[in-house]
């Protein structure tokens, strides 16, 4: 077979015409130091702050310090396989996490990867973990109540949808229990909940997940966990991953509750990273931008305007105090960022008052606008009455003679404390809260012995379910107080059948 010269020249011409002369340029650096979750790389001249970089073994990192001769990178995964001299390359992307309804009911790490052994999460939607908070004109005043199901909170320090309410207290004072009860109470409220566990023990997170599953709350909850065994970069990123997953729902007109348990551990992880990156330490060795760490996170909680869909994202950040010291650096920072705080006292907790909410120092800066009309009417003076009772109680311990008015205040105060006690994982519907608080504030409980108050309340709720369903549904639908006669008839009707202890 003869090959003609014309064919050969035509083929060569075609090859020349189709030749692609584009060169793929990728910015590559070299690892010069690695350890403790931090790497320093030389040669990434054009890398951006916060950009994702990829090491030669596939582990990702986040560029943080851009210095004259090197780049400080926090490593998002195991760093033991990374060696000095390894290649590290830019990706041109910032960090994103998967979002969407496919995550609901799952337990994921801060990178959005499932850790519950239930298989992959089939979602293609992602959002950047750092995004600007909604602007002033995109927001609306907080006006819808978020019912926690906890009498002491819904009556004394009400939380609204889109609010940021700090839960602060020493370790072992019931902070997590408050959050779990709130999540459990959202069952029929069309609310998506996100529980972010930062630096918790794996066993604790397991217990939380099982509690949520047992009460049917995992059907509308995402659990994001960065446990104590994880490297510091994941603890630092966990809250941002949680709020990003929540924002996807908020911008689609849904209502979201995000619990950060707890931000003290995130601040400690960020301090660790900052010191390893050789950033100058400030007060309590925290870096200078630790306020911005929390403010840019909590500002992303909002109640959106109707034009933006009317969705909301409510934040419940936790801060752990040392021996009740709320004047430390991180507690004062977060108190100044949030719209109020619920202060849990260890003294109250160990004396059997649970939830151990200190009415004197707890405050909600949204207040009555986050309560239904019925609740704001029955709980109007409750907080002041409770605070004055605490003062009188201390005074009465001296055993001096008390006048009738003071004695009456002490008696009412003792009953108030008993009514506000609540069992673990037993959230109460708002209409039942209204009726028992009405009975308390209008003096219907003054003749019930203090030791019987808790039993009276439990039996009263059961009696209401079978004998006063009309009253319950009226409060639920109108959100206003029914006629005094209806309340009196229901309360007196039950008092006739209630048997007080001797």
Curated annotation (Swiss-Prot):
Record has Membrane as a keyword: yes
Q: Does the keyword Membrane apply?
A: yes
The gene behind this protein is atpA
The species this protein was found in: Bacillus mycoides (strain KBAB4)
Record's function text: Produces ATP from ADP in the presence of a proton gradient across the membrane. The alpha chain is a regulatory subunit.
Give the start-end ranges of region Disordered: 115-135
Which E.C. number(s) belong to this protein? 7.1.2.2
Q: Give the keywords, sorted.
A: ATP synthesis, ATP-binding, Cell membrane, CF(1), Hydrogen ion transport, Ion transport, Membrane, Nucleotide-binding, Translocase, Transport
Q: What is the protein name stated in its UniProt record?
A: ATP synthase subunit alpha
User: Location of site Required for activity?
Assistant: 362
SUPFAM superfamilies on file: C-terminal domain of alpha and beta subunits of F1 ATP synthase (SSF47917), N-terminal domain of alpha and beta subunits of F1 ATP synthase (SSF50615), P-loop containing nucleoside triphosphate hydrolases (SSF52540)
């Amino acid at each position: 077979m003869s090959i003609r010269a014309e064919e050969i020249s035509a083929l060569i011409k075609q090859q020349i015409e189709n030749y692609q002369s584009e060169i793929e340029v990728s910015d590559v650096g070299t690892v010069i130091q690695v350890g403790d979750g931090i790497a320093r790389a030389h040669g990434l001249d054009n890398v951006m702050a916060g950009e994702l970089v990829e090491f030669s073994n596939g582990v990702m990192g986040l560029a943080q310090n851009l210095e004259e001769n090197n780049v400080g990178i926090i490593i998002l995964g195991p760093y033991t396989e990374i060696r000095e001299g390894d290649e590290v390359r830019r990706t041109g992307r910032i960090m994103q996490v998967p979002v969407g309804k496919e995550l609901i009911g799952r337990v994921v790490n801060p990178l959005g990867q499932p850790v519950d052994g239930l298989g992959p999460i089939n979602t293609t939607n992602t959002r950047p973990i750092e995004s600007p908070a909604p602007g002033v004109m995109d927001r609306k005043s907080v006006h819808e109540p978020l019912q926690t199901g906890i009498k002491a909170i819904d009556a004394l320090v009400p939380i609204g949808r889109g609010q940021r309410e700090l839960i602060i207290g020493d370790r072992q004072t019931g902070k997590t229990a408050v959050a779990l009860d709130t999540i459990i109470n959202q069952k029929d409220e069309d609310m998506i909940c996100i529980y972010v566990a930062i630096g918790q023990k794996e066993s604790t997170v397991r217990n939380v997940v099982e509690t949520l599953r047992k009460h049917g709350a995992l059907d509308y909850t995402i659990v994001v966990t960065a446990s104590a065994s994880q490297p510091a970069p994941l603890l630092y990123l966990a809250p941002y991953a949680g709020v990003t997953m929540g924002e996807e729902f908020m911008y689609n007109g849904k209502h979201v509750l995000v619990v950060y348990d707890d931000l003290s551990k995130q601040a400690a992880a960020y301090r660790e990273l900052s010191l390893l990156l050789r950033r100058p330490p400030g007060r309590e060795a925290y870096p200078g931008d630790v306020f911005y760490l929390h403010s840019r996170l909590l500002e992303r909680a909002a109640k959106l305007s109707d034009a933006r869909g009317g969705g909301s994202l409510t934040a419940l950040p936790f801060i752990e105090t040392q021996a009740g010291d709320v004047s430390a650096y991180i507690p004062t920072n977060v108190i100044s960022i949030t719209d109020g705080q619920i202060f849990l006292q260890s003294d109250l907790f160990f004396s059997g008052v649970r939830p151990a909410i200190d009415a004197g120092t707890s405050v909600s800066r949204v207040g009555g606008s986050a309560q239904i009309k019925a609740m704001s009417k029955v709980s109007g003076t409750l907080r002041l009455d409770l605070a004055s009772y605490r003062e009188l109680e201390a005074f009465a311990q001296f055993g001096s003679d008390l006048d009738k008015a003071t004695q009456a205040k002490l008696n009412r105060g003792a009953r108030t404390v008993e009514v506000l006690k609540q069992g673990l994982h037993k959230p109460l519907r708002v209409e039942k809260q209204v009726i028992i608080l009405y009975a308390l504030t209008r003096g219907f409980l003054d003749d019930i012995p203090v030791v019987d108050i808790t039993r009276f309340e439990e039996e009263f709720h059961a009696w209401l379910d079978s004998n006063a369903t009309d009253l319950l549904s009226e409060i639920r639908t109108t959100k206003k107080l029914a006629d005094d006669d209806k309340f009196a008839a229901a309360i007196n009707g039950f008092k006739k059948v209630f048997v007080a202890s001797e």
